[in-house]
Amino acid sequence: MEGLNVNFEELEHMDLEEAKKIVSHFNNEDDYEELGATIDGIEYGLDIVDESNWDDQGKYQYKDVTGILCESLEDGSVTKYDIAVTQYITRSGSYFTSYNYEYDPLQVDQLVQKVIPQQIIPERTIVVFAE
C-alpha cells in the first residue's frame, strides 16, 4: 500500500477493539457513501479517502473503498479517528444486463505513521534513444 492521503495530526486516537464494536453496527452491504450507524445518539460514518477503480478479472470485477471512521454530533462538529474501514466489493454481470454485488465483511484497521527513509539510486548506465 502506498499510503493514504490523510493528515494524521488531525486524527483522534480510538482503541481498535472499540472501533470494531462500532463498525459491527454498520450494514456492510450499504453503499460505501452510506456506511454508518447511530449508537447511543452518536452518529458514526466514514470519510472516504481511497477508492480503487473496478478491476476486471473476466466474470468478476473487484473494487475496494477505504474511509476514516468519523463521529458527527448534532452541532455539526466532526471528529475523525485513526481508524480505517475498508469495504471490499465483488460484482458479476454486465452493463447490458444487471450487476450482482457481493460484499466482504468490513475490515477495520488502526492507522499509524510510517517514516520512509530517503533512498538514493546508485549510478548506473542505461540505453536510450539518441537525441
Feature roles, as predicted:
Residues M1-Y60:
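N-terminal domain-onset segments
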Residues L11, S72-E74, E131:
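Generic structural motif
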Residues G36-V108:
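Acidic, low-complexity, intrinsically disordered interaction modules
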Residues R91-E131:
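Acidic, proline/glycine-rich low-complexity IDRs
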